[in-house]
Amino acid sequence: MMQALGQGHIDADTYAQVLRRHHRLLAGFEEQLSDWLVTLVGSGWQYRRRVPALREDLRVLGQPVDAAVPPPASSEAARWGMLYVIEGSQLGGRVIARMLRKRQPGLAHALHYFELADEDPAGWRRFQAVLEQRLQSAAARADAIAGAQAMFAHFHTCLAAEARP
């Protein structure tokens, strides 16, 4: 499904399913770590919430919002690793939005989530610089790697399975 999305070969129902799965994943992350995400400004990074854009896209498509699935929470360094995965996943959003506009123009009104990356094209480089500053010890880097691996597994779980009521 994700490969078809990246190539723009996806119908509206499947696209809505992708958005619902992303919502499950990101709503869980943003709800569980909401307080921590607000403190990131003091570290030099401002997290841009994705859930409002996802909810808007789902609303436009007339789709329900699936329940949030929180990721495993851990140390602050592990949270930075989790955030690394989320911020990195945004990079492909531009490509996906561009491809869908070209191949599925009927979905152009529901691309708010994937177009978030366009708001700050240099953001990834800035995030990497902040990450370097926050993870200076070998132990912090090891925890961040564990957090990133946990978030990759969480992505896989949320994107691969249908939501259960």
Curated annotation (Swiss-Prot):
Induction: Expressed in dark and light. Part of the bphO-bphP operon. Keywords: Heme, Iron, Metal-binding, Oxidoreductase. Its EC number is 1.14.14.18. It holds the Pfam family Heme_oxygenase. The keyword Signal does not apply. Catalyzes the opening of the heme ring to form the open-chain tetrapyrrole biliverdin IX with the release of iron and carbon monoxide (CO). This is Heme oxygenase. It comes from Xanthomonas campestris pv. campestris (strain 8004). The gene is bphO.
